[in-house]
């Protein structure tokens, strides 16, 4: 009898349907930097204008980045007050940390408030919080700070994820899926908040991979509400999370890594990161979509982490994608740069909005099935299979 009762309890705890994205919100710092003029600004503010050859290399990197603009918390005024941040490897961790501890939760708050407003439900319905960032390790962490900033219940179940890097946005969705589907009625607030203050530093001839990061990375935060079995009257589904997996790519150790030092976060990139990802992308697709009998990669919508133009180009070429398949990822790269873990949630937001604007039938550019990829340190690849929903028909109240 006890075994039967335990089974009944277990079944009562589980949701009936798939985890679903119910709302998305994004936020960026007010300070905007344009890629066309960034090399001049960067070498001037770091007092490195004497490195003319290096500046020319950086200019070429920026020109090839396919980025139009980025947003950054670090303004020239802040950098003038913190000159050690502008040096290449000066002891500056305390100054960087002081900035991140305040700004990471604050930026996350901006994104979370937008997601909560779109969701339209009371804060008391949020049961879980998952917070992801590469900056500002502290106890209690950014999850605690955000709970206070938003006025969430003190009983919200929190999970703090530090130092995941660029695959972290997919990771939080995978974890939220597991939470929502195994806790009936759960509503999970996921937040990814990233700022470049921990990794900003002056240029150095012997560390060109650091310059690559300075040409690509920007600040941004994204949030989403995840839950299973949406209330048909009060909640509007955006995407369903069908399956999720994570893998470490073979022979990829050291391709992307980051180390927290007294000089801040140092990031190292091998040149062949795009090649390593593209060589393994088909296997990830086959493993994810074999149960669905899908093998035409142009028949699905794509949410790929916009790590840089070379990654998107190589993946497109490898699987024979139409150029328009990566449109949402390229738009986020162009307008915001690589925002690490927050990026894929920005891409989700762009896709569902552009699908509605273009009059398409579903939130996934008119397609039913889609894939979300996160790429990051390890090399680690996160793969999520998504299912779109019909684009909502505007009502008189929302028009």
From Swiss-Prot:
Q: Which residues act catalytically here?
A: 166
The family database entries (SUPFAM superfamilies) matched by this protein are listed as: Thiolase-like (SSF53901)
GO molecular function, a single term:
naringenin-chalcone synthase activity
Record keywords: Acyltransferase included?
yes
A biological process (GO) of this protein is:
polyketide biosynthetic process
Q: What induces it?
A: Strong in response to inoculation with fungi.
Name the chemical reaction catalysed here. (E)-4-coumaroyl-CoA + 3 malonyl-CoA + 3 H(+) = 2',4,4',6'-tetrahydroxychalcone + 3 CO2 + 4 CoA
User: Which keywords accompany this UniProt record?
Assistant: Acyltransferase, Flavonoid biosynthesis, Transferase
EC number of the protein: 2.3.1.74
The answer to whether UniProt assigns keyword Acyltransferase to this entry is: yes
A Pfam match is Chal_sti_synt_C
The record, for PROSITE patterns, names: CHALCONE_SYNTH (PS00441)
Pathway(s) the chain acts in:
Secondary metabolite biosynthesis; flavonoid biosynthesis
**Family according to the record:** Belongs to the thiolase-like superfamily. Chalcone/stilbene synthases family.
* Known role: The primary product of this enzyme is 4,2',4',6'-tetrahydroxychalcone (also termed naringenin-chalcone or chalcone) which can under specific conditions spontaneously isomerize into naringenin. Substrate preference is feruloyl-CoA = caffeoyl-CoA >> cinnamoyl-CoA.
Official protein name in the record: Chalcone synthase 2
Q: Which gene encodes it?
A: CHS2
